[in-house]
Amino acid sequence: VGDDDQSIYGWRGAEVDNILRFERDFPGAKIIKLERNYRSTSHILGAASGLIAANRDRLGKTLWTEDDSGDKVRVRGVWDGEAEARLIADEVETARRQGVKYSDMAVLVRASFQMRAFEERFVMLAIPYAVIGGPRFFERAEIRDAHAYLRLILSEDDDLAFERIVNVPKRGIGDTSVQKILHLARQHDLSALTAVRGLINTDELQARTRTALANFVRDLDRWRDLAASTPHWQVMETVLEESGYTDMQKADRTSGQTRLENLKELTQSMQSFETLQAYLEHVALVMDLDRGAGDDAVQIMTLHGAKGLEFPVVFLPGWEDGLFPSQRSMDDTGIAGLEEERRLAYVGLTRARRRAHVSHAANRRMHGSWVTAIPSRFVGELPEQHIETDAAPGLSAAPAPTFGGAGGFGSSFGGFRDFGGGFGSRPQ
């Protein structure tokens, strides 16, 4: 059994051609199409079928159901990502008042960095949620590392922060040396960083370790001076670059790109706060309130992670060209990448049993600047008879039907340095 329309793991080596070539590879085999659907309503199936029909390489089938009830797929345009999070949180609360359980609702994102806005909004409104397939945003290792740098810049007395990042990235400061520093600090009632300042002028540690620690202290002092006159989010970008943390993630071909996207989202979210102190207090509050959810919780996950699952109500945010479909996928594999992205959209829509909500933002904050986005071409491929559109004043729900994304993420991102060039802003 296989479904060419749900082949979404090309980046893992899964070949949709294996299904498309089946009749050639096994001549005489009988093909049985399973087209009757018992999960979704006719409007959801109609929208999904109309969307996937735009793919050139597929065997072709039309899903149908006897269930003619249910709402049309709702397509909403909003001003920016934060407005999108507010909209979906409001829709969740409305559905809950109508008797829908939290666990019967899911938010399916294209990229993990999108989760941050929804997590923070849900915490603020005391909406229980669970991130499926990975840790919550502020619990991710790269986010905790970044926060540890900020906390140590803000306060030399934060020994937990010191212990976390004194050798991240690797500086040649081994665990034995770190434990010796912490022991000495406790023995003399000092902070770990104060103890280091004394140790680097003695011969109690190896010369190589003392040099590494001296460089670390010098970097911290420089970043602390920078924080006195520079916006805190720019300080964060500088720390990630100068510490070697960004380069460490670039070297990780398995998950480094995802971590860099999360760090990018982190620096952008910091811009909503006037000071570093205010930001860190906000993080502490969110972490304190976010004690984990019980069984009845909104499910947040990536579209890839949602394959095989189903929910009565599904929210599909971020349907903007360049974000979804992913510009990187299209750049890497062209039409094949676009078609796999479309299959991913099809999977997302068909996770919904009763209601599906698609949303797109007119603006996304990128590298400290607002970037104008256009609705995903997938929005324009949804059959009108199966959707209900609603946009904020001045926003359009109709995308420009271009491959590279004229005016959207595809072109606007080109004006900024990619993470291949670090956390830069517009090139000079």
Outline where the language-model segments fall.
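Conserved helicase NTPase motor core
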Residues: 1-20, 36-40, 239
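Short alpha-helix plus adjacent loop in nuclease-associated cores
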Residues: 5-10, 39-40, 130-154, 166
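Metal-dependent catalytic core segments for phosphate chemistry
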Residues: 8-12, 19-20, 45-46, 50, ...
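Well-ordered alpha-helical segments embedded in enzymatic catalytic cores
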Residues: 18, 84-91, 145, 265, ...
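Helicase P-loop NTPase motor core
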Residues: 27-30, 35-128, 151-155, 187
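RNase H-like polynucleotidyl transferase catalytic core
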Residues: 33-34, 127-136, 358
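Conserved helicase C-terminal RecA-like lobe
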Residues: 101, 115-127, 140, 147-389, ...
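Acidic, low-complexity intrinsically disordered tails
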Residues: 382-428
